[in-house]
Structure formats: structure tokens, C-alpha cells
Amino acid sequence: PDADVEAGHTDAEGYKGIFQQMMKEFGFKYVVSTLRESFSATHNGWKAMIYNGEEFYTSKRYDIDPIIDRVGGGDSFSGGIIHGLMTKPNQGAALEFAVAASALKHTINGDFNLVSVEEVEALAGGDASGRVQR
């Protein structure tokens, strides 16, 4: 594949081959992954990808600065993708919801995401600047 996972390169399109191999090997319905760009302990870029065997989708990228607490960000993403796949019209909308939920969690102290569905949807459907503000 074209992705250099060990070197930490975050070229999302390069992960498509890895996702295809995972689907072939394990028979997953979806393969989903987040990509973090770490500029400092309190400043990260954040996006994700989803693949269903036919369509590969990359979310918009969020610039999270400052990060208040990363703990719970992965759980928030996982809950967001489950919610999104159950309620949104397509995998792209589901992924945008999950990434927005996780990005917002990075701005909250503690391991619980205390935002509403409406707040997540407002960020996911925002102006695409990718700037997380609370």
C-alpha cells in the first residue's frame, strides 16, 4: 500500500489499500480510522476515513487548538460512528458526525463527551473551516 503507517504520514488516500486488505481478510462491512496530526501537546489536526468496499470517504479536517483533554476522544468517535451509521443517510454523513463529536470532546475536560447531538450536527454541518471553537 501507499501509506507509511509507521512513519506517521497521514495521506488518507494511501490507506485505501490497507482498508481493502482488511475487508478481504476479515469480511468487515466498514473499515474506519482516525488520523491525528500532532503539532504540539495542545494543538492537533483531526480527521477520519471510512470505506465500505465500494466508496472511500475522508472527512473534513479539524484544527483543534487548544486541546483540553484527549481522554475520551476515541470513545466519542466510536459512539459517533455507531450513531451516525444508524441515523445518517450515508457513510460520509455518519463519518462527519463521528469526527465532529470527537473533535468537540477534545475541548472538554474529563472522559465524557458532554455535548448534545445538535452541537455535533452544527459543527459537522458548519462552514468547513475545520476550526473547533467552544
Task: Report the location of each language-model feature.
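Conserved phosphate-binding/catalytic region of the ribokinase-like
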Residues: 2-134
